[in-house]
Amino acid sequence: MSWVRFTKTGVAVVATSAAAVLALDMTNERRFQRQVKDHFRTVHADRLAELNKRAPSALPTRKDILTNLSKGEEFDVLIIGGGATGAGVALDAQTRGLKTALVELDDFSSGTSSRSTKLIHGGVRYLQAAIMKLDLEQYRMVKEALFERHNLLEIAPHLSSPLPIMLPIYKLWQVPYYWSGIKAYDFVSGKRVLKNSFFINKSQALERFPMLRNESLKGALIYYDGQHNDARMNLAIILTAIRHGAACANHVRVEKLNKDETGKVIGAHVRDMVTGGEWDIKAKAVINATGPFTDSIRLMGDPETARPICAPSSGVHITLPGYYSPSNTGLLDPDTSDGRVIFFLPWERMTIAGTTDAPSDVTLSPQPTDHDIEFILQEIRGYLSKDVSVRRGDVMSAWSGLRPLVRDPNKKDTKSLARNHIIEVGKSGLITIAGGKWTTYRHMAEETVDRVVEVHGLKTENGCVTPGLLLEGAHDWNSLQYIHLVQDYGMEVDVAQHLSNTYGDRAFVVARMCKMTGKRWPIVGQRLHPEFPYLDAEVRYAVREYACTAIDVIARRMRLAFLNTYAAHEVLPDVVRVMGQELGWSSAEQRAQLEKARTFIDMEMGQNAKQTAVSNVALNLTKEEMQRAKERFQQLDKDRKGHITVNDLRKHFREHNQKIDERVLHELLNEVDLNKNGEIEIAEFFQLYSGLKGGQLTGNRLVGYLDEIHGTPSVNRACGGI
């Protein structure tokens, strides 16, 4: 049911229902809190204290881990899949005293786990469904998510933090409706509430979020959820498991599952995608934690499986410049044109928006489409002030992630599929964990290991100790740590903050790897890109964090591919060069890595979608319009080469006393360069103006700059463009 269809009468019914449900739960909630506190502070207190001691030694190398995996010794547990769920299972199993192995086809967090909305949801959307549909399962999911959110913020404070999210209200009847729902969320949160929600009036809302549309605005509700760096969080779980003794390797593919004479799975035959080496891994239990690829592994274990249990759904997000949102407040649009929700959030000094939700095929390389991107932009335009021009050219990156939703055969649309999980035991003994969401990865892992121990009769040293178990970088971290990096190493403040919030207490290890700048300030820290705080030393450290490809670095160790595809392209040569030094790559391998990374950025990070928006436009210019566009082209191509380079743009702007940042110059060229050859040809110029005239494009920065300089009407204005 759409949010806007509720009436004032419905509000009263909802509030009454919510009060009844929550009143009945009050006693159980308090009892549950006491049980959790008593259990994990007494039963496993000694074990947890031992495990939470910071390991001073370096991580084992990938070569050491592969040697351990290929020795032929039997593991208690072999996990297939290195996303959030697989990583959580590895950490849980290893800290119970089980000998644990994990293999991942690509990189840790290369799939869905790095392509989320970056929120640690307490489940506010599920609470609405629980109340409106009297759905007890959804309500339990909310309670589970609230506990897990609290735990995640505690065990990795350097990678996560509370984020206030604004819910703007444009109709008076929505005030009590949303207020009662958000207050119910606070109530269910109990002691785990991050901060109490509150209502602010129109002027306060605009002061907090100045770019918000002010027409008919009545006020806004502010509630709190968690936010994190998803790929780094995933990696922190993996690194913690490795430090406790687990053997976890990325870029290792399962070729087949090995079985005994009775058909029971007893391990897997694997292949190292880096070296090509193959071997068998023996295991008493094998766990399938492959997210959207769940069914392919299930079919290896039990070919007679009747039908799939996973229904993948594609969710697209986009990245916009940081000025699109305040640095400390997100926005929730609870009622988009298709009945879903859109989040608009500050993240890593940029702004991310999403998401879409549509059934999808399973693929290793999901790609955002221009249709998805335009849908998100259109929804954003509806909530932002008319003074804010939401431009297609401002989309710095876009990505698609496949949600591993559990299939319900009685429902066709993915909107109704809950993000809960199931644990299946196949006839072959293969354990499959499917579904779920980022926030509840730990609980899913706990239930999975419980089931594995039960089914396979494994002996553990202790029960689950992952609530309260600190992750890599959290042990000695505090929010003022970056000051020590500035004072002790002579780093720029934004660089020090980035290192502290990315590596936690391991930031000092990265700092010691930095080279001198040769300047008075900063003393150390060579930036890879002038607009971002990433350092060349981080590339070297990334190799120690098991980065094997340039994509591993730019997408997951550093998040530059998710933040700005142009900048990612620009730093790639330096990233490949440093990795080549660390890993001994030949010139041919470096060229191959560069090409693969460029393809990844273009295909999976939205660069091609932007080009498609222009390249699919048919030429529709009159003779006069083509002549006008040609004259504008020749103003830039003064030596009549037949194409425009970034040097031509630079010279033109300098001649007209326009100071344009070097990064922006490259972006202006890339937005029009359909052929991706570093040049703008006359045909591409005509294509651009045709798109502006036909309305397929809502604006172009290069055309806008040229109009400002020359003052003559362009096709953008004279030919009916939006």
Curated annotation (Swiss-Prot):
Residues 1-43 form a transit peptide. Residues 624-659, 660-695 form the EF-hand domain. Its EC number is 1.1.5.3. Its cofactor is FAD. Pathway: Polyol metabolism; glycerol degradation via glycerol kinase pathway; glycerone phosphate from sn-glycerol 3-phosphate (anaerobic route): step 1/1. Its main location: mitochondrion. It is found in: Mitochondrion. Ca(2+) binds at D673, N675, N677, E679, E684. It is an enzyme of class 1 (oxidoreductase). FAD binds at residues 76-104. Calcium-binding enhances the activity of the enzyme. InterPro entries: DAO_C, DAO_C_sf, EF-hand-dom_pair, EF_Hand_1_Ca_BS, EF_hand_dom, FAD-dep_OxRdtase, FAD/NAD-bd_sf, G3P_DH_FAD-dep. The keyword Calcium applies. It comes from the Eukaryota. Pfam families: DAO, DAO_C, EF-hand_7. GO terms for biological process: glycerol catabolic process; glycerol-3-phosphate metabolic process; glycerol-3-phosphate shuttle. Coiled coil: none annotated. Keywords: Calcium, FAD, Flavoprotein, Metal-binding, Mitochondrion, Oxidoreductase, Repeat, Transit peptide. SUPFAM superfamilies: EF-hand, FAD-linked reductases, C-terminal domain, FAD/NAD(P)-binding domain. The keyword Ubl conjugation does not apply. It catalyses: a quinone + sn-glycerol 3-phosphate = dihydroxyacetone phosphate + a quinol. Gene3D superfamilies: Alpha-glycerophosphate oxidase, cap domain (1.10.8.870), D-Amino Acid Oxidase, subunit A, domain 2 (3.30.9.10), EF-hand (1.10.238.10), FAD/NAD(P)-binding domain (3.50.50.60). GO terms for molecular function: calcium ion binding; glycerol-3-phosphate dehydrogenase (quinone) activity. PANTHER family: GLYCEROL-3-PHOSPHATE DEHYDROGENASE, GLYCEROL-3-PHOSPHATE DEHYDROGENASE, MITOCHONDRIAL. Belongs to the FAD-dependent glycerol-3-phosphate dehydrogenase family. This is Probable glycerol-3-phosphate dehydrogenase, mitochondrial.
